Amino acid sequence: MLLFTMGLLLAILQPSTGQFPRVCANTQSLLRKECCPPWEGDGSPCGERSNRGTCQRILLSQAPLGPQFPFSGVDDREDWPSVFYNRTCRCRGNFMGFNCGECKFGFSGQNCTERRLRTRRNIFQLTIREKDKFLAYLNLAKNIPSKDYVIATGTYAQMNNGSNPMFRNINVYDLFVWMHYYASRDTLLGGSNVWRDIDFAHEAPGFLPWHRAFLLLWEREIQKITGDENFTIPYWDWRDAEDCVICTDEYMGGQHPTNPNLLSPASFFSSWQ
């Protein structure tokens, strides 16, 4: 059902894979408030002819908001994604995605019935070749446009309630940077006024599962652009670390020798914008 940024814990229950599906970032979809694209396998909305899913009205939580957010109807992320769309694909079985064209995490195969076990490893236990491949995959994601998703450059009100779509292309890596920002940014109250005492991604019980789903989605997009179905994001076990031992030019980048706000020029990431 949910298909965009995971603004609420509800998105963990029915995962999404990005910000706004490109096929729904248009006037017709926004005015109809419907995002039920056809699955390319059979050409029907949500793959309905193949029993993958159906186009349904989204079900919103009726739970009251907490006192830390004393507003209603001012933030596009409220009751996400109902401000933009109130009908989306509800996928059946092990299918997921904005058109039910993906398999749920841990499944693969034509009908998403095959279990697939992937193992994440400590980044310090990777071989030099494995570590270099990981960095190369990140660099590819930074330089390849997202095929399926775009990001919003304005609020729904600025889009004139859908009649003036405001979206732009983005690369695969920055798509997830944007998703994280979009879910956690301040509430825009109009003009220069903002409400800072809110963070939909971090200051709530959904902190851990939100980031778990976020990383799974990021991992999946890198698998797709590289064709490497066995790719997993390595982890850094920092429990006993006294400083940032991963902040070296061999890994995530050391500090610039003269400017503490920049990465070392020898870092793989120093040329990123």
Swiss-Prot record:
A Pfam family recorded for this sequence:
Tyrosinase
Q: What reaction gets catalysed by this protein?
A: 2 L-dopa + O2 = 2 L-dopaquinone + 2 H2O; L-tyrosine + O2 = L-dopaquinone + H2O
Q: Which residues are glycosylated?
A: N86, N111, N161, N230
- Places the protein is found: Melanosome membrane; Melanosome
Which SUPFAM superfamilies did the record assign? Di-copper centre-containing domain
Protein name per Swiss-Prot or TrEMBL = Tyrosinase
For this UniProt record, the keywords arranged alphabetically read as follows: Copper, Glycoprotein, Melanin biosynthesis, Membrane, Metal-binding, Monooxygenase, Oxidoreductase, Signal, Transmembrane
Q: How does it sit in the membrane?
A: Single-pass type I membrane protein
Q: How is the cofactor bound?
A: Binds 2 copper ions per subunit.
As recorded in Swiss-Prot or TrEMBL, the protein's gene is named TYR
- Entry function: This is a copper-containing oxidase that functions in the formation of pigments such as melanins and other polyphenolic compounds. Catalyzes the initial and rate limiting step in the cascade of reactions leading to melanin production from tyrosine. In addition to hydroxylating tyrosine to DOPA (3,4-dihydroxyphenylalanine), also catalyzes the oxidation of DOPA to DOPA-quinone, and possibly the oxidation of DHI (5,6-dihydroxyindole) to indole-5,6 quinone.
| Binding-site positions, Cu cation | H180, H202, H211
What start and end residues bound the annotated signal peptide?
1-18
Needed cofactors: Cu(2+)
Q: What is its EC number?
A: 1.14.18.1
At the top of the EC hierarchy, this enzyme's class is: oxidoreductase
Which InterPro entries would you find in this protein's record? Di-copper_centre_dom_sf, Tyrosinase/Hemocyanin, Tyrosinase_Cu-bd
The record, for PROSITE patterns, names: TYROSINASE_1
Q: Which domain of life is it from?
A: Eukaryota
Family to which this protein belongs = Belongs to the tyrosinase family.
